[in-house]
Amino acid sequence: MTKELKVQSSPQALKAGHLPAVKAGGMRVSKKQGNDENSAPEKNAKKTLQEKPSSVLNMTKMQAMNILAGELEKLSHDFPGEAAQIAHQKPRPTVEKIIMPKRLYLIQQPRRC
């Protein structure tokens, strides 16, 4: 088994810098190589430098939302919500549409003997 690992890791077995794809069920599946030890700390690493600028951006967004909320309150007194609801509703039909039942077409066919 150790011989197989040495053969696979040799530069001759590598294609384009990685292991060749393996066929499984008629489809090619790539084998992922890498150290699990190296990838785990990157996922769990805390990025405090990126959190600080985002918190500043969040504060500016919150201030902008407060300004907009004040403007919306002024507009709500000028234009009531009931008028907006009526404008967005579908118009009621004056004549109701009559739905005809589907016709069943029975084809008379002779019985099998």
Curated annotation (Swiss-Prot):
Say yes or no: keyword Protein biosynthesis present: no
- Tree of life domain: Eukaryota
GO function terms (MF aspect): death domain binding; ribosome binding; translation initiation factor binding; translation repressor activity
Alphabetized, the UniProt keywords read: Translation regulation
Disordered: region residues: 1-53
Which family does the record assign? Belongs to the DAP-DAPL1 family.
- Name it: Death-associated protein-like 1.S
The primary gene name is dapl1.S
